[in-house]
Amino acid sequence: MHCFVKQKNPFKTQRGVRSMAMKSFPRTEVAGVSLPRMLMGTNWVYGWSHTGAAADRNIVRMNSNREAIQQMLEAYLAYDINALMGPISDKPFTYDAIHAAEDKTGKGIILIDTPILNVDDTPEGRREAERVLDKVQKGGATFCLIHHSSAEQLVNKNKQTIERLPDYLSMIRDRGMIPGLSAHMPELVLYSDKNEYDVQTYIQIYNCMGFMMQVEIEAVNKIIHEAKKPVMTIKSMAAGRCSPFVGITFSYNTIRPCDMVTVGAMTADEVHEDVEIAMAALEHRRPDLEGRNSPNRTEILQ
């Protein structure tokens, strides 16, 4: 696997994230498309906290609206982080925020949609899958990565195949989109490569805590490094179970230069902090961040 890396653009840091110079985030290439090595996540917009219903509802109250999403998109776009991942076509209110952010910044956003498909081996199941893919295409997605809950129904571990997957990949190609897999199950990466399916990239859960990972961290690290195509990692902060500094730093220092880390945020300020942490990890330096608040903050926490 050849890893494509654009030129490094170091930050000219100052005290406090919001005042630092905003440079373009490093990029990679997937199926001929230039992508930032940080992808915009959507769990903290759509209400998938992985903690509980109360947290889910709080996210929805805060962020499932055009204004909040637009502010976060603009924060990412300030660093040319211009690729958004998630089941976007299933959340149509997102499009208003996307178009508003694009109009305001003059920068286009690449959509990486992860639709849930009916993979029943029946005429009606196929028609329903086609209707969903038509909706994804209409929404303007560049990449269409079949959701893990759909793709994993097709896995045959005995044969080391993903049954009937080429049919769905062809449906995606026929609609002018680049096919891939939202692969929570590590075997999806292995079987895609082994059988040379038209899978141009794969999502893979990867974090320093092993959160939601189906095998050991070391095993997934090996899968990522041996993958034939670039990997889009998700859950880098284990859904808030580790700090951004720990989670993001681990991810960028243990994947390849062609791979990506998906990072979601609750606010635009969090975007700026996360980008600074990521840039510091890539440049092997300490991130320049403001100290955390504390009831009696001592000098060591300044």
Residue ranges and their predicted role:
Residues 2-19:
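Short, Lys/Arg-enriched N-terminal segments with co-localized hydrophobic residues
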Residues 20-43, 47-52:
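N-terminal amphipathic alpha-helix/helix-capping segment at the start of soluble metabolic enzymes
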Residues 28-37, 56, 61, 67-85, ...:
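Structured C-terminal cap/extension of enzyme domains
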Residues 40, 179, 231:
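Conserved, mostly hydrophobic/aromatic
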Residues 43-45, 89, 114-120, 149-151, ...:
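Active-site beta-loop-alpha junctions enriched in small/polar residues
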Residues 62-159:
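Active-site beta->alpha loop and helix N-cap motifs at the rims of alpha/beta catalytic domains
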Residues 90-104, 152-168, 186, 212-221, ...:
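Active-site-adjacent beta->alpha loops and helix N-cap segments on the catalytic face
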Residues 139-142, 173-175, 194-203, 226-230, ...:
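Glycine-enriched alpha-helix->loop->beta-strand junction motifs that scaffold or abut catalytic
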